[in-house]
Amino acid sequence: MQNKQEQWTVLKRLMSYLKPYGLLTFLALSFLLATTVIKSVIPLVASHFIDQYLSNLNQLAVTVLLVYYGLYILQTVVQYVGNLLFARVSYSIVRDIRRDAFANMEKLGMSYFDKTPAGSIVSRLTNDTETISDMFSGILSSFISAVFIFLTTLYTMLVLDFRLTALVLLFLPLIFLLVNLYRKKSVKIIEKTRSLLSDINSKLAENIEGIRIIQAFNQEKRLQAEFDEINQEHLVYANRSVALDALFLRPAMSLLKLLGYAVLMAYFGYRGFSIGITVGTMYAFIQYINRLFDPLIEVTQNFSTLQTAMVSAGRVFALIDERTYEPLQENGQAKVQEGNIRFEHVCFSYDGKHPILDDISFSVNKGETIAFVGHTGSGKSSIINVLMRFYEFQSGRVLLDDVDIRDFSQEELRKNIGLVLQEPFLYHGTIKSNIAMYQETSDEQVQAAAAFVDADSFIQELPQGYDSPVSERGSSFSTGQRQLLAFARTVASQPKILILDEATANIDSETESLVQASLAKMRQGRTTIAIAHRLSTIQDANCIYVLDKGRIIESGTHEELLALGGTYHKMYSLQAGAMADTL
């Protein structure tokens, strides 16, 4: 829970985003100040009219009335411009905060995403930033306007009659006590409400992502119950927040204002005429009480939103300040030449406690293909994670062209490694943009890459060809078509190293022959590392490494490993037997 000091820290940091918009903010504040000055003058004009002209209407009285209504019109126009300027500042600040949060998120390492639900991140970048926007566009201007109005009104009241002003000021300590009490009680409830909203987003994202599995295994009722539980808890805390607002805000503040009226009227009735207080002055004071209390009522009504904004800003800043980055590179000056890879006694653990890779050593050169096989959890994909620098290894060396992998920049490393995953990921856009990945790739290069992997044939059959739209995750294409597009994307980037992470695992046997032909062409002249479930797809590898519990237990060609009669032989025999049973 945020304490008072943390809230001030968050608020000061939010205010720092105002710096680039200093002139715009100054103009907005100027218009707000002008609005409050006009509001303060209007009751004086009314008071003067009541005392001087109400019983003696003449041409000058008409002029005073015109001034009175003209001030109201001017106040409306000036207030509109001020609010408009504040809204522009608000949206600009939220844009900057989202930009900073997204930029930092893009640099975070895989370990952060392993432990943070996607829905929680989305909630911070959308819901929480929208709450911050509400604070700047409405609440902040209300707070500043309230301060201006309070000070100008108080000054005008003191000039008009200090005795009546002293009576009104007796209520101020009660107001500040009320606001402080509300602040203390509301913070915890608001933080819990925002946290539960984040949980709802996470649960929604998880269910949408896994809807096929949920329906296939009849998990709808169980997950509905889990969602209802979180949703109900959110409702409970939301109702608590509303109840707190209803108790401490308008009813309490309105009661204080009515008490102020009562005290003022009683004092006027008891001593008003004897000490020379005019009806016009009394009218002006009633108006000033409204102007004194109404901004305070508005501020207290917006206080819950301010508290919510403080909590939301704290969550967004936590994302901006997150430093679980990808492994750091050293000087980053090295360039990939051939793409020769060597692991020397590499050990790796995701949590620093449980080893995933234990003393891994192997090498592969340009034009060669090696493969890693093993049961689930044996460490196959972890080797790729280490090579791609998604995670930092604890000991050993990883060399690329005999240069420590840390001496390459992330950009140099990633642009020379083509990664093809088991589940090809396509972005919302077009086929052309998915192959080019928004790089400076010509249409001819895109088409050549597609033709190289035999994807051109089905693309040309589409009504819009390479400009055909791609829906989210490419759901309108078959698995084989999505994989061919992923191959074309890799070829278009012209990498020196090719990594195939079970690239054919989800493809049917009929499509596999086409995909394998494309893979064979892609591997030519490149350093290739393949992770395979189907052993039939890696029989032509120069060397096959068998992993078990993070260690290499066997290595050799397909024929050598079969002759060895070990783990690989058993795995191959099981797959061959399963294949025979299906025929």
Curated annotation (Swiss-Prot):
Q: List the residue ranges forming a coiled coil, or say none.
A: none
Extract the Gene3D superfamilies matched here: ABC transporter type 1, transmembrane domain, P-loop containing nucleotide triphosphate hydrolases
Instruction: Identify the residues that bind ATP.
Output: G374, H375, T376, G377, S378, G379, K380, S381
Query: Where are the bilayer-spanning segments?
Result: 26-46, 61-81, 135-155, 159-179, 259-279
Keywords assigned: ATP-binding, Cell membrane, Membrane, Nucleotide-binding, Transmembrane, Transmembrane helix, Transport
Residue intervals of the ABC transporter domain: 341-574
User: What domain of life does the UniProt record list for this protein's source?
Assistant: Bacteria
Instruction: List each copy of the ABC transmembrane type-1 domain by range.
Output: 25-308
Q: How does it sit in the membrane?
A: Multi-pass membrane protein
DNA-binding is among the record's keywords: no
Task: Please name the PROSITE patterns in this protein's record.
Answer: ABC_TM1F, ABC_TRANSPORTER_2
One GO cellular component term noted in the UniProt record for this chain:
plasma membrane
Single GO term (MF): ATP binding
Q: Which Pfam families match?
A: ABC_membrane (PF00664), ABC_tran (PF00005)
Q: Where in the cell is it found?
A: Cell membrane
Describe the family membership recorded for this protein in Swiss-Prot or TrEMBL: Belongs to the ABC transporter superfamily.
Its protein name is: Putative ABC transporter ATP-binding protein exp8
Its taxonomic placement starts with: Bacteria, Bacillati, Bacillota, Bacilli, Lactobacillales
